[in-house]
Amino acid sequence: MTRAIITGAAGFIGSHLSEKLLAEGYTIVGIDNFDPWYEPKIKQQNIESPLKHKNFSLIEADIRSFDFLSLFKKNDTVFHLAARPGVQDSWGQGFLNSVENNIYGTQRIFEAALHAGVRRVTFASSSSIYGSSATGPERKVNPISPYGVSKAACEQLAEVYRERGLDLVPLRYFTVYGPRQRPDMAMNRLFRAALPGSFRFPLRGNGNQRREFTFVEDIVDATVRAGYTLKSPSLEAFDIGGGVSASLAEVMALVEQITEASIRVDQYPVADGDPLITVASTEQASKLLGWKANTSLQDGLQQHYESFSE
């Protein structure tokens, strides 16, 4: 039976990936440090279902210090999702967390995977690496936030380890939403601001910022395909996006339609490091992974809302 490692297994995307692979018959070892950056009990709830499965085991460990080598020797595929997320939290002293978790932690995983003879490492990069050049065929990696810099550095590390023979696949996720989304992320905040209570959505700018929102199940589908369907070795980095770019104002209108309520808003200036628009180029993902997003924004928001209001 195929065995795989998932770092960040109790997180938003990692818990969905764990469930997907278990349902397909894989044996999974999940790694998570339950960082109190947000409430650990949320992650504990995320991972409840996998923990009940006979083919799942969980190691509570930190990627900055855990000895991966012996574990990796027993597994053929690694899905590396563990990271310190968040553009705004990466400014100032917060960048140290980005460096330690995203860059150093990733380098340790690549190093161990190389020496353990792992077949492939598929890892989560981000649309943040594009910065303001996030559209058009000539766009370049040009991050405008410390978080984006940390993710771009991970991709550069991937190039270095590819030269040494490690098969690595970076996936540039575009604005992921859906059930179990982190509490600091926009969709959760929008629904909180529409449902009864006192929470108000912190709207930065006028809502004209456009994002390519991607439903978590589509993200997981692409991730599994990158891990197992893609021919080896891979020399690609793939944009993984939902197919349609929508403005925040348009999303707010959809949330109000779904909840039949008005969103409470406090308005602030545009945040540093926040690009005006992100648009994915998914042609390579379609060609080499056989992947495309299947969830419309309307349907994805409905599923997000139903899980949020449970």
Residue ranges, per PLM feature:
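Conserved active-site region of classical short-chain dehydrogenase/reductase
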Residues: I103-E111, D184, E217-V220, V224
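Conserved hydrophobic/aromatic "anchor" residues
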Residues: F12, F123, F174-Y177, F213-F215, ...
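The catalytic Tyr-centered alpha-helix of NAD(P)H-dependent dehydrogenases
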Residues: R139, P143-S150, Y173, P179, ...
